[in-house]
Each structure stands twice: as structure tokens, then as C-alpha cells.
Swiss-Prot record:
UniProt name for this protein: Tetraacyldisaccharide 4'-kinase
Taxonomic source organism: Serratia proteamaculans (strain 568)
Alphabetized UniProt keyword annotations: ATP-binding, Kinase, Lipid A biosynthesis, Lipid biosynthesis, Lipid metabolism, Nucleotide-binding, Transferase
Catalytic reaction annotation: a lipid A disaccharide + ATP = a lipid IVA + ADP + H(+)
GO annotation terms (biological process): lipid A biosynthetic process; lipopolysaccharide core region biosynthetic process
Top-level EC class: transferase
Pathways per UniProt: Glycolipid biosynthesis; lipid IV(A) biosynthesis; lipid IV(A) from (3R)-3-hydroxytetradecanoyl-[acyl-carrier-protein] and UDP-N-acetyl-alpha-D-glucosamine: step 6/6
Pfam family, one: LpxK
Amino acid sequence: MIERIWSGSSLVYLLLLPLSWLYGLVSGLIRLSYRCGLRKSWRAPVPVVVVGNLTAGGNGKTPMVIWLVEQLQQRGYRVGVVSRGYGGKAEAYPLLLNAGTTTQQAGDEPVLIYQRTAAPVAISPKRSEAVQALLKQQPLDVVITDDGLQHYALQRDFELVVIDGVRRFGNGWWLPAGPMRERASRLNSVDALIANGGVAQPGEIAMRLQARDAVNVASGERRPAVELPHVVAMAGIGHPPRFFATLEKLGVAVEKEVAFADHQEYQHGPLAALVSSEQTLLMTEKDAVKCRAFAQPNWWYLPVDAVLPPDQAEQLLHNIEALLTK
């Protein structure tokens, strides 16, 4: 229902416009208060790169964060990541992730980033505290903040925004009548704009998600997803149809699709009931980090990598590296 409202195909959004106007007013005043110095912001002693969204709901931000971390690591930079840790509840903040940190503590996206990149990751509702915790632990050349475009309490040196290249900005309204967190004109002040899927517009960098072989959640075995038998596909991400479309493009014969809410918490019983012993449960990697402790032998996940055009990727990295060598 929310997708129909935000896309403009349902007139229900008209009923939500008063709330959207209020949201837009408040968010605009918050940003203005920081720009005018009425609220204080904190500047880190190292460059901060924000990877964020202008809209709510599954734009492909996490794969982009992972790509950026890995690219900078390959160039010899010491990279740290901070996040709010949405979906998790730590006993105390800031929380520095380690091999034993659970998604219940830190949220699924920080755990996924930590496991994929081995970069130091810290979470806190106050991102400045997370940055300070990272720097206290070890020296870093750059900090990447996962989301946080609207978190103006932390000053940033480079803003990178990921948009859904297919859905774009929906009906163009602020939350909750539409998907917008800020006006589209906010893009005029960012340093890079990544279009995930669809057709990139002038000034945007095209990005696509490339699937790897499927991985068994329990054993780590790898196999082409198309070889998995009797697949039941599940996704608890911001935009589940993207995952299902990826499987279709790969030629995976999906018998059933199951969509969950983003950051959904899972338990063994309900997930096990989705498939018989002859079927395969195929999920996203973001879902898998929440299921490893109780995974069954017929549970698999599909890792994806962000892929950018080489020339545009090189220019993007060049612009970021220029900050690190000042």
C-alpha cells in the first residue's frame, strides 16, 4: 500500500499532506539551525564521507558503502564506518563491533558491513560519539558514515547520495505522504549522486548490483543460484521486489516470494515453516546475518556487489582521495 501511495498511483497521499508539510517544515528548520550556527555541530579530525539517501526505503546504500570501503582499503587507506545502528539495541553507546556482536545489538546493516569488509565499525545514535570511539581505538584516514545525510550534528567533507534509479523520487512529497526526507533540490549541494538501476540522468553515476554465487548460510558452501532446487525467496529489505527481480534475471525458478519488513527480526520456527525439506530458502545477505545462529542446511543467501562504470568510479575515488591527501 505504501508503495502505491508514494508512487503517486493512489490518492490516499492527499490525506497525509498536512503531516508532510509539518515534516518538511521541521526538517528544513533543523538544517537551517545548523547552517546558521544556532545548533552546534562537531568536526572530526579526519575526513568524513556520508553515504546517504534523500528518500526512505531501500535504495542500495549498504552495497555502496561496502564498495567504497573496499575500494579505499585496496588503495591502502585506513577506513572506519559509523552508523546509527537502526534495528539494534545495545546496552551502551557507542558500541564498537567485534566478531561476537549480534544484529540485536548493532542492527543488521552494521553487522553486514563489518563482516564483509573487516573495517572497524561503531554505532551510536550520536554519530560524533561513534567517530570518537573509532579514533580512540585506532588511527584512521577516513570515516564513512552509513546513512546520516540528515544528521547535521556531524560535519562532513563529502556527501554521496544513492537513489533508486527506477522509482526515483516517487510522488515527490515529504514523509509520510511521499518518500522524501528532504526536497529534491538538496541534491544540488551534494558531491556525488549514484543512481542504482534504471537509467542514470546527466550528472549521476550509474550503479548496478551484481550477484555472486549463492552461499549456504550454515556451511558456507557456494553454488550458482540457478542450480538451487525448489526455491522459496524471502527478503526483509527496504524494497523486496528488487531482490525478486534479481533472481528472475538470474533464471532462478522461484516457487514462492515472501516479503518481510526492513530490519525484520527473525526466529527459527517461522522461517523453517516457509520451506519443506525438499525446498530451498533463498534470502538476501542482509537477512542472512540475522539467521546464522539457527540456520538450516537448506537455507542460502545471495551476496551482491555494487558495480560502477570504471571511469566514473575512478573519478569518484579521485575526488575522495583528494580530501585524504590534504
